[in-house]
C-alpha cells in the first residue's frame, strides 16, 4: 500500500535532511521538493563522492527514483541547469527522471538585484542575512500576481510582454528607491529563452503524476528545505525565509491532498545552529578554544552549504523543538550529528524560558519576545566514548541513550531515527517512517 512521508527541519535549517532523505529513498518511488529555491543547500556523501544540491531533490542519486519540483518552489532555471550538468558529469542521469511543475514562479535577474540592493541598504541590526539569490522578491511577485512562471516559457511573446512590464516596475524601485543599476531586458530575456529549450522537456503535470504514482501503489517522499523556525508564518519573523517550510506546505506546494500525507519525520540536530540574523536563545561562543560552542562549530563543520558562512551554534532548545512538533504534526523525530557532542563533560537541554519574569515552555512567535527569552537549562552528563558510526541503540554509550531518552520525555514524541555520521549506513533505526 502506498505511504507518503514528509521530511521537515524542526530548527533553523541545516539539520541534515539531505542524508536522511537519501537514506529513506530506498522505500520511495519518487522524491518531491515543495517549497523554497536554490537558497537551500543539502550535502550528500555517497561512498567517496560528495554531492552539494540546491534545487534537484536528494533522490536523484538513487537510480530509478523519480524526482519532482512542485509548484511551491521558486525556480532559477539557469542555476537548475548548472546543477544538472554537474550531476551528469558525475554519471547521474537526471533529465529523464526530473519533472518540473509549470506553476513554479521563475527567479530572474532583477529578483537577485533587488534582493542584494535591499539588504545593502539596511542597517546592520536589521539585516536578515539573505543569501541574495532573489528568493524573497520572487515570492513577492507570486503573491502580487505578476510573477513569470515556468508555464510562460512556452510562449515567447507572452513572456516578453510580462517581462517588459515587470522590468518597468522593478527598475523604478532599483534606480529611484535603492540607488542601484537597472536590469536590461535583452539580458534577462535571452538567458530565459536559452534555458527554456532545456527546461521545457522536463515540464509535466506534477500533481497528476504524483496521484498516479500513489494510485499504482508507489510511495512518495516529500523533501522539505530550510527549517520550521524560518517559516514565513511560524518562524522568528521577520528573520525568516519567504516560504512556508512546514509539513502542511507539502500538500499545497505539490498539489496533493493533505489526507495523503501519512507520516511526518522531524529532523533535529543534537544541538542547535542558525545562519544569518535573528534571535537564538541558546547561542554559545563558537570562537573560544575548548568551549562546547567551539566544538560544535569545528567538529560539526558548521559552515553554510550555500553561503559558506559560519553557523551560530548553541545547546538543543526543546522549547523551540516542541513548537515545531506542534506546528508540523510530527510523528517521529530523527536526531542528527549526535557524534559532535562526543567528549563533552556535560550537556545542557533548554526546557523552557523566563520571559518578563514568567516561565514559558514554548518558543513565542515574535522575534522581539524571543530576544528577551532567557533559557532554563537542565544539565546532563556527557559521555567519553564515541557515537560516530554507531548502527544500533545498544552501541551508544549509556549517557548518550539517557540524553536521547530525556529529549523524548520532554517533547513527548519518539525518536525513530538517529544519524551517527554522513554515510547511509551510519544510521540507527528504531521505527521506520515508511513502516510506522
Curated annotation (Swiss-Prot):
List residues binding substrate.
305-311
Q: Which coarse location class describes where this protein primarily resides? A: cytoplasm
Q: Does the keyword Transmembrane apply?
A: no
Query: Which positions does UniProt annotate for Mg(2+) binding?
Result: 14, 41
This protein is called what? Adenylosuccinate synthetase
Q: Record the organism.
A: Azoarcus sp. (strain BH72)
User: One Pfam family for this entry, by name?
Assistant: Adenylsucc_synt
Name the lineage.
Bacteria, Pseudomonadati, Pseudomonadota, Betaproteobacteria, Rhodocyclales
**Which Gene3D superfamilies does UniProt cross-reference here?**
Adenylosuccinate Synthetase, subunit A, domain 1 (3.40.440.10), Adenylosuccinate Synthetase, subunit A, domain 2 (1.10.300.10), Adenylosuccinate Synthetase, subunit A, domain 3 (3.90.170.10)
> Which pathway does it operate in?
Purine metabolism; AMP biosynthesis via de novo pathway; AMP from IMP: step 1/2
Class of this enzyme? ligase
Subunit structure, per the record? Homodimer.
Cite the entry's keywords alphabetically.
Cytoplasm, GTP-binding, Ligase, Magnesium, Metal-binding, Nucleotide-binding, Purine biosynthesis
Where in or outside the cell? Cytoplasm
Amino acid at each position: 500500500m502506498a505511504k507518503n512521508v514528509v521530511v521537515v527541519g524542526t530548527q533553523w535549517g541545516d539539520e541534515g535532511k539531505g542524508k536522511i532523505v537519501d537514506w529513506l529513498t530506498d522505500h520511495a518511488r519518487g522524491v518531491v521538493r515543495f517549497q523554497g529555491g536554490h537558497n537551500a543547500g543539502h550535502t550528500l556523501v555517497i561512498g567517496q563522492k560528495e554531492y552539494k544540491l540546491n534545487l534537484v531533490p536528494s533522490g536523484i542519486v538513487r537510480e530509478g527514483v523519480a524526482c519532482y519540483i512542485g509548484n511551491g518552489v521558486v525556480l532559477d532555471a539557469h542555476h537548475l541547469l548548472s546543477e544538472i550538468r554537474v550531476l551528469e558529469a558525475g554519471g547521474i542521469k537526471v533529465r529523464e527522471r526530473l519533472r518540473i511543475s509549470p506553476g513554479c514562479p521563475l527567479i530572474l535577474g532583477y529578483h537577485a538585484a533587488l534582493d542584494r540592493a535591499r539588504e545593502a541598504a539596511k542597517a546592520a541590526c536589521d539585516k536578515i542575512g539573505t543569501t541574495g539569490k532573489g528568493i524573497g522578491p520572487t515570492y513577492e511577485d507570486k503573491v502580487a500576481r505578476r510573477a513569470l512562471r515556468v508555464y510562460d516559457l512556452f510562449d515567447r511573446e507572452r513572456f516578453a510582454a510580462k517581462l517588459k512590464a515587470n522590468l518597468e516596475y522593478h527598475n523604478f524601485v532599483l534606480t529611484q528607491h535603492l540607488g542601484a543599476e537597472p536590469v536590461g531586458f535583452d539580458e534577462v530575456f535571452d538567458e530565459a529563452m536559452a534555458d527554456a529549450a532545456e527546461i521545457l522537456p522536463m515540464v509535466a503535470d506534477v500533481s497528476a503524476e504524483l496521484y498516479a504514482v500513489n494510485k499504482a501503489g508507489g510511495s512518495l517522499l516529500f523533501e522539505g528545505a530550510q527549517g520550521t523556525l524560518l517559516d514565513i508564518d511560524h518562524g522568528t519573523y521577520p528573520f525568516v525565509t519567504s516560504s512556508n517550510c512546514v509539513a502542511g506546505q507539502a500538500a499545497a506546494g505539490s498539489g496533493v491532498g493533505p489526507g495523503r500525507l501519512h507520516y511526518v519525520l522531524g529532523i533535529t540536530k543534537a544541538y542547535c545552529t542558525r545562519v544569518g540574523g535573528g534571535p537564538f536563545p541558546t547561542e554559545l561562543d563558537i570562537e573560544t578554544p575548548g568551549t562546547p560552542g567551539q566544538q560544535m562549530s569545528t567538529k560539526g563543520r558548521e559552515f553554510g552549504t550555500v553561503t559558506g558562512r559560519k553557523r551560530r551554534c548553541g545547546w538543543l532548545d526543546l522549547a523551540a523543538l516542541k513548537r515545531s512538533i506542534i506546528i508540523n504534526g510530527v510523528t517521529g523525530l530523527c536526531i542528527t550529528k549526535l557524534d559532535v557532542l562526543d567528549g563533552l563533560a556535560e550537556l545542557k537541554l533548554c526546557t523552557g524560558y523566563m520571559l518578563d519574569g514568567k516561565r514559558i515552555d514554548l518558543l513565542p512567535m515574535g522575534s522581539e519576545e524571543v530576544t528577551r527569552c532567557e533559557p532554563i537549562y537542565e544539565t546532563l552528563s556527557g559521555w567519553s566514548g564515541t557515537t560516530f558510526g554507531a548502527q544500533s541503540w545498544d552501541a551508544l554509550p549509556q549517557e548518550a541513550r539517557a540524553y536521547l531518552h530525556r529529549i523524548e520525555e520532554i517533547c513527548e514524541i519518539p525518536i525513530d531515527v538517529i544519524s551517527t555520521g554522513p554515510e547511509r549506513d551510519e544510521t540507527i533505526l528504531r521505527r521506520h517512517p515508511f513502516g510506522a
